[in-house]
Amino acid sequence: MTSNDGDRSNGDDDGRPHGDRAVLALAREDWRTAADAYVQAAFATFAGYEGFGYGAFGDRTEVGVAVAHLCRASVCHRLADATGRAQNRAAQGALVAADAREHVATERVDEGACEELVGVCRVLADDPDAATAAFDRARDAYADADVADPAGATTRPVHQAGTDLLTHLSRPDDVAWDDVHGTGGDALARRVRFLRSKLPEFVDARVRDGKLHAARASTEYNTGYRCPACDATDVNYHSPAVLCLRCSAVVEAR
């Protein structure tokens, strides 16, 4: 069987977690390998073999992380000119998020977070009408939940996974928590509005630029490191490597 987005990866994962291999593939701009690694990271996280080991179905569910990895895989497939596979990964993510809404979430506020992820996946699947409907359901779920501390609710596991995905897809523009949620008492409602208006722009920008940067981790500026690709001295510390904060090239392997 042949593929339209590059050679088949060789399966040599050198013992690293799949998520780490995805980061290294992003640094090499090897989008096919990054997509495959993110898919493997998604299902390993879902099963409880990666991440914090909680899996999808417990009280501290990591289902949001798994769906976010499928979304990252979708973007990488787009960068590899594999639109069909990109849509497939997004559709998988939407199914997982919808299942979590029905069978994992126990509070209305968490149902809203699952609906957000459905909306993100539908954006990536080129289905704007379904995305709009999902974001509407998320908005309504948050209104029904009427949580006392909307800003605090954004740290719940599925919400945090969604925030991490959004900030990742925003790079190199690097939107911050305040950009997404504001400083008032309507953090959840504002979050949905931000997703609805900005996510398609971020996805289009990544495809137009032909690059998905590594997510922002721990960063440091004006260091003794120097990027071999762009000469920058600002770095992004990831577990598999020190990366350039500006272009995501490997500055120092680990």
Locations of the language-model features?
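Structural signature of alpha-solenoid helical repeat scaffolds
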Residues: 57-61, 65, 81, 104-106, ...
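Terminal disorder- and signal-encoded targeting elements
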Residues: 1-58, 222, 227-230, 234-237, ...
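Domain-level recognition of nuclease-like catalytic cores that cleave nucleotide substrates
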Residues: 131-134, 138, 154, 179, ...
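Cys/His-clustered metal-coordination modules, chiefly Zn-binding fingers
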Residues: 161-254
